[in-house]
C-alpha cells in the first residue's frame, strides 16, 4: 500500500509540473492534441472494443443489472460518437487568454481580467468509459492537467483509453504527464488523493450518490459535484397532450440510466384523465413500470398492458436509473412547485404548458440547474447545450452550475496596465 500511495503522490506531482507549460500552450497545439486523440480512438477501434468486452464480461459475471451494464458499453457507434465529440471540443473557441471586464480608472490605470486555467483537476468517476475521453479533452482544451480515476467496472477500457490519450498529447508536442491515470482501483487511494491539496486544484466526482457523498466528506480540495438527478416533468392543465406525451416518453425512455432522465411525472388533475392513459399506453410499449399515487391508479387501472403498482413514500425523491416512473396527480401548479421543492435534487425540471404565466412562474420559482418549458429533460447535456461535451452536471451553485464546459474549468487573474502611477 505504501508503494501505491507514493505512486499517487508522484502522479499528482507530475501533473502539477506539466500544468505550467500546458497553461500557456497555444490554441493550435492544444487543438492538435485533441484531433490526435480523436484519430487515435478511431485507429485503435479493435483494441478498444476488445478491452471493453472484457469489462462487459466481468460485469455480467459479477451480476450487474442490464440497465447499469449499458453505461459501460462501448460499441462502434458509441466510439465514433466519442471521437466526434472530441473533434467538436477541438473546434470550440479557446477560453484561455480571453480579456474581459476592462475598465479605465480615474487615475488612468486600465484594469481587467484575463481567463486562465485552474491548474490540476482530479476526476473520480464510475461506469462510463467515455468520461475518460470527455474529461481529458475538456481539461486539455482549457489548459488544465488532469488526474483520471475511473471505476473498477471499466478498468480495461479506461486503461487503453488513457494510454492512447497520453500518446496523442505527446505527439502534439505537449507533456504527456498532463494526463495521469490511476490504474489501482483501491478506494483507500482515492482517500489519499483527496488530501493532496498542494498539487490538485479541483476535484470533480461523477457517479452515484455514494461516490459523491464520499468525495465531499473526505476531500481537502474544493469539489464540484454533479450527477445525482431526481428529475420531474410537470404536465400543466393547459398542456398540449401530444407534446406532453412525447416529452414524458422521451424524458423517461430514451436513455433511462442517465442522470437527466425523468424520475417523477406530476400531472394536473384537469388533464390527467386524458393524458395519463395516453402516456401509459406509450410507456407500456417500452416496458416502463408506473408507480402511481391513488388518483393516478384510479385513472390507469383499466389501461391495457400497463405495468402499474401503487407508489410508496420512498418513490418520491428517488433517482430510479431504470424504466420506472413515479406518477402523481396534483391539484395545482402550486402543489407541483411544492413537490419539486421538497423532492428535487436541483438537476433538471420541466413544465409542459401552453400557459405563459404558468411557464414563467415555473422558470422563476423552481430552484434547479436547468429549468425547461416544453422540452425533454434529456437536453441537459454539454453537447446539447453547445459546450461540446461536459465534465459533469453540477447541482451546486458554487462555482459552476449545470453542464460544466470549458469556461467552468477556468479562473481569471486581474491584469493592470499603468503608465507610471503610484499610490498616494
Curated annotation (Swiss-Prot):
Leading EC class: oxidoreductase
One Pfam family this sequence matches: Aldedh
One CC-aspect GO term: cytoplasm
GO MF entry, a single one: glutamate-5-semialdehyde dehydrogenase activity
Cellular compartment(s): Cytoplasm
Record flagged with keyword Transmembrane: no
One annotated GO biological process: L-proline biosynthetic process
Domain of life of the organism encoding this protein: Bacteria
Alphabetic keyword roster: Amino-acid biosynthesis, Cytoplasm, NADP, Oxidoreductase, Proline biosynthesis
InterPro entries: Ald_DH/histidinol_DH, Ald_DH_C, Ald_DH_N, Aldehyde_DH_dom, G-glutamylP_reductase_CS, Glu-5-SA_DH, GPR_dom
Reactions catalysed: L-glutamate 5-semialdehyde + phosphate + NADP(+) = L-glutamyl 5-phosphate + NADPH + H(+)
Pathway linked to the protein: Amino-acid biosynthesis; L-proline biosynthesis; L-glutamate 5-semialdehyde from L-glutamate: step 2/2
Cited SUPFAM superfamilies: ALDH-like
Protein EC: 1.2.1.41
Family, as annotated: Belongs to the gamma-glutamyl phosphate reductase family.
Role of this protein: Catalyzes the NADPH-dependent reduction of L-glutamate 5-phosphate into L-glutamate 5-semialdehyde and phosphate. The product spontaneously undergoes cyclization to form 1-pyrroline-5-carboxylate.
UniProt xrefs under PANTHER family: DELTA-1-PYRROLINE-5-CARBOXYLATE SYNTHASE (PTHR11063:SF8), GLUTAMATE SEMIALDEHYDE DEHYDROGENASE (PTHR11063)
Name used for this protein in its record: Gamma-glutamyl phosphate reductase
UniProt source species: Dehalococcoides mccartyi (strain CBDB1)
Gene: proA
Amino acid at each position: 500500500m505504501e508503494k501505491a500511495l507514493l505512486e499517487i503522490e508522484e502522479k499528482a506531482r507530475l501533473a502539477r509540473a506539466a500544468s505550467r507549460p500546458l497553461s500557456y500552450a497555444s490554441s493550435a497545439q492544444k487543438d492538435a492534441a485533441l484531433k490526435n486523440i480523436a484519430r487515435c480512438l478511431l485507429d485503435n477501434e479493435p483494441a478498444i472494443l476488445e478491452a471493453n468486452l472484457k469489462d462487459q464480461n466481468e460485469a455480467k459475471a459479477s451480476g450487474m443489472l442490464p440497465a447499469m451494464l449499458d453505461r459501460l458499453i462501448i460499441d462502434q457507434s458509441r466510439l465514433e460518437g466519442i471521437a466526434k465529440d472530441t473533434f467538436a471540443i477541438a473546434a470550440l473557441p479557446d477560453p484561455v487568454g480571453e480579456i474581459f471586464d476592462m475598465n479605465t480608472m480615474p487615475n488612468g490605470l486600465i484594469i481587467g481580467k484575463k481567463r486562465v486555467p485552474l491548474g490540476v483537476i482530479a476526476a473520480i468517476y464510475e461506469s462510463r468509459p467515455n468520461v475518460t475521453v470527455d474529461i481529458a479533452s475538456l481539461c486539455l482544451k482549457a489548459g488544465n492537467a488532469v488526474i483520471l480515476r475511473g471505476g473498477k467496472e471499466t478498468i480495461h477500457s479506461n486503461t487503453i483509453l488513457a494510454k492512447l490519450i497520453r500518446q496523442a498529447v505527446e505527439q502534439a508536442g505537449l507533456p504527456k504527464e498532463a494526463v495521469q491515470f490511476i490504474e489501482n482501483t483501491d478506494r483507500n487511494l482515492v482517500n489519499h488523493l483527496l488530501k493532496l491539496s498542494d498539487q490538485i486544484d479541483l476535484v470533480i466526482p461523477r457517479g452515484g450518490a455514494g461516490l459523491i457523498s464520499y468525495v465531499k466528506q473526505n476531500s481537502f480540495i474544493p469539489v464540484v459535484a454533479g450527477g445525482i438527478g431526481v428529475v420531474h416533468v410537470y404536465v400543466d392543465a393547459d398542456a398540449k397532450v401530444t407534446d406532453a406525451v412525447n416529452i414524458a416518453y422521451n424524458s423517461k425512455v430514451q436513455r433511462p440510466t442517465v442522470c437527466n432522465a425523468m424520475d417523477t411525472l406530476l400531472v394536473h388533475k384537469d388533464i390527467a384523465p386524458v393524458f395519463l392513459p395516453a402516456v401509459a399506453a406509450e410507456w407500456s410499449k417500452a416496458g416502463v413500470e408506473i408507480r402511481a399515487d391513488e388518483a393516478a391508479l384510479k385513472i390507469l387501472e383499466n389501461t391495457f398492458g400497463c405495468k402499474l403498482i401503487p407508489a410508496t413514500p420512498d418513490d418520491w425523491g428517488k433517482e430510479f436509473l431504470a424504466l420506472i416512473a413515479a406518477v402523481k396527480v396534483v391539484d395545482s401548479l402550486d402543489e407541483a412547485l411544492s413537490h419539486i421543492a421538497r423532492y428535487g435534487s436541483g438537476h433538471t425540471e420541466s413544465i409542459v404548458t401552453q400557459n405563459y404565466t404558468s411557464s414563467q412562474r415555473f422558470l422563476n420559482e423552481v430552484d434547479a440547474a436547468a429549468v425547461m418549458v416544453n422540452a425533454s429533460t434529456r437536453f441537459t447535456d454539454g453537447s446539447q447545450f453547445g459546450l461540446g461535451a461536459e465534465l459533469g452536471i453540477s447541482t451546486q451553485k458554487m462555482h459552476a452550475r449545470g453542464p460544466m464546459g470549458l469556461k467552468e474549468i477556468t479562473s481569471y487573474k486581474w491584469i493592470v496596465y499603468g503608465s507610471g502611477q503610484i499610490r498616494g
